[in-house]
Swiss-Prot record:
Pfam families: Glycos_trans_3N, Glycos_transf_3. Mg(2+) 2 binds at residues 225-226. Pathway: Amino-acid biosynthesis; L-tryptophan biosynthesis; L-tryptophan from chorismate: step 2/5. The keyword Chaperone does not apply. Keywords: Amino-acid biosynthesis, Aromatic amino acid biosynthesis, Glycosyltransferase, Magnesium, Metal-binding, Transferase, Tryptophan biosynthesis. One of its GO terms (biological process) is L-tryptophan biosynthetic process. It comes from Actinobacillus pleuropneumoniae serotype 7 (strain AP76). Homodimer. SUPFAM superfamilies: Nucleoside phosphorylase/phosphoribosyltransferase catalytic domain, Nucleoside phosphorylase/phosphoribosyltransferase N-terminal domain. 5-phospho-alpha-D-ribose 1-diphosphate binds at residues 81, 84-85, 89, 91-94, 109-117, 121. Mg(2+) 1 binds at residues 93, 226. The gene is trpD. Its cofactor is Mg(2+). This is Anthranilate phosphoribosyltransferase.
Amino acid sequence: MQLDNILSQLFENQALTKAESQYFFEQVIQGNVSNEQLAGALIALKVRGETIEEIAGAVEAAFANATAFPAPDYAFADIVGTGGDGQNTINISTASAIVAATLGYKVAKHGSRSVSSKTGASDVLSALGINVAISPQTARQALDENNLCFLFAPLYHAGFKHAVPVRQVLKTRTLFNILGPLVNPAHAKRQLLGVYSPEVLKIYAETVRSLNHQHSIVVHGAGLDEVTVHGETLVAEIEHGEIHYFSLTPEDFGIQRHSIEALKGGEPAENAEKITALLQGKGEAAHIDAVAVNTAMLMRTFGERDLKANVQRVKDLLSTDKAYQTLQNLAQYQ
């Protein structure tokens, strides 16, 4: 396969096969593609619209070149958002991962520093005293013993650094933004995946299906890359190779509505303070409900289908400080 041929195809508005896309992105990750070539390719893909085969090929390239994580044989999930919704809310999926782990569900959360919001998952975890840059073996130990680990994307996908200069100059969403949530190095086959726009719900759902996930749920919540407490959440549930599309309201979870303003966050220290209060059993009502609906949905990927019952379990837990203990335990893994 020739790099020049692939670039020519892209510039002639032709879609790549999965194998061609994988080859191209392996070259990118290995540092064999110039900034000019990469910029041209990413723009060509974006303007035409990336196909499922092209995204899946890029995912396979990322996995083929990633630092290995010793994947467990037990059931575990990931909870992640694409980011880029522009709303600067508190880190709901990070808090939900800690809560789910406290309830006994194993979560290997993949994430990175903030790209578009003030505070990404690793930013808030660092502010909470967690070392996000632990080795794969230590992370696996944390997952085994404490039901929770955080996999810091730059440690596992070091080759993505070759795309950083181009991404910074382009300042627009590219295929790399699509990739982030799909390349968990633990190869999670259960996932709650929040997306920044209703337009990309279907492409994510179909890509997740092509990656043979066991039970994953893609959501967009009225402007948020989360299940929302202020409006309708659009859902694509992928199970046994089938996709079911439906929508949910806060009432379907048995909670009252809250304004999006009630979920606003800020710098890492501010978000860390709010999450600490929540985990200690002193959370604000809107924060409790936002984490409850997202954790409830994550529990569903483990077969816990009753969303109202799931929410109640979370709310009962968040009236105690047990989830804070999980966070403190996680801080011991250095």
